[in-house]
Amino acid sequence: MILIFFAYISRRETVSQRQTSTIVYNITLMFSTLRCALKILAQIKKRLQQTSSNHENKKYEEVIKDHVGVKIQNIICLLAFVLVVYYQMRCKKMT
């Protein structure tokens, strides 16, 4: 619904249909990527909780923690992508 509202507002501001569809596609892609990243982090958290009780799996737990660090870096890159898309939208509205 948010995307439909955004597309409606964009059309009212005389943005071409091609630009509107590109913006909506970028936002949809961003949200789907974020949703996948959150699912992966939830699975990793679940695995950490399952293995933390077992003393033999300390090495495995450290590997998963490193994996979580990589996923956090990916989320930071995703947020940077969001800022770039937002900046591009603002620049297009100014011109």
Swiss-Prot record:
Its main location: membrane. The chain crosses the membrane at residues 21-43, 68-87. It is found in: Membrane. GO terms for biological process: cellular bud site selection. It is a multi-pass membrane protein. Coiled coil: none annotated. Keywords: Membrane, Transmembrane, Transmembrane helix. Disruption phenotype: Diploid deletion displays a weak budding pattern phenotype in a systematic assay. GO terms for cellular component: membrane. It comes from the Eukaryota. Partially overlaps SNU56. Disruption phenotypes caused by deletion of this gene may also be a result of a defect in its overlapping gene. This is Putative uncharacterized protein BUD26. It comes from Saccharomyces cerevisiae (strain ATCC 204508 / S288c) (Baker's yeast).
